[in-house]
């Protein structure tokens, strides 16, 4: 399925997150979900090529652990995973990825380059409840912004940290581009 990718800023490694399975996003259910998998690659300097791991299935982690089976369908937005230039926990700089669900958009993050994931902010209150095809990016102060497609415009929202390392903070209220002057 669609994939999103990030190259680690310090280690010669890649992280790819993709959709997988035999069901489309629109028909996915908790019982028969669109799967979420990661693959990692490291560069072999001797062979002069990238060596990929086998896919790691995170479906249960996302549906059950992170969202308590409350979201019937999830899709990691295709394109790019964002890596922080500020927050480093252990070996890796934090990565952020935008998640589409039928209950709105969320941002998830990993401090171990995709081995485990957490929700940025609330797992029950979406940062863009009516959003679709969401993207995220880190701002210069470490805050995270989302841009989410909506009918006739976009939603924007910003997560501000109270504690960067522990990922504690809150989302603002989403802004509808159609309601902004000149939007």
Language-model segments: which ranges?
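Beta-rich carbohydrate-recognition and catalytic domains
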Residues: 1, 7-78, 82-183
């Amino acid at each position: 399925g669609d994939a999103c990718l990030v190259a680690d800023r310090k280690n010669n490694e890649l992280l790819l997150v993709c959709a997988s399975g035999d069901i489309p996003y629109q028909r996915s259910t908790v019982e028969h979900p669109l799967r979420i998998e990661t693959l990692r690659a490291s560069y072999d300097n001797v062979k002069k090529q990238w060596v990929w791991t086998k896919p790691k299935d995170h479906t249960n982690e996302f549906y059950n652990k992170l969202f308590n089976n409350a979201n019937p369908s999830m899709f990691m937005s295709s394109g790019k995973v964002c890596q922080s230039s500020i927050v480093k926990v252990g070996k890796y700089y934090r990565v952020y990825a935008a998640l589409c669900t039928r209950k709105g958009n969320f941002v998830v993050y990993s401090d171990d380059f995709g081995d485990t994931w957490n929700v940025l902010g609330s797992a029950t209150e979406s940062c863009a409840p009516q959003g679709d095809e969401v993207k995220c990016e880190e701002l210069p102060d470490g805050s995270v912004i989302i841009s989410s497609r909506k009918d006739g415009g976009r939603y924007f929202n910003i997560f501000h940290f109270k504690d960067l390392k522990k990922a504690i903070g809150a989302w603002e209220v989403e802004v509808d581009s159609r309601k902004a002057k000149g939007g």
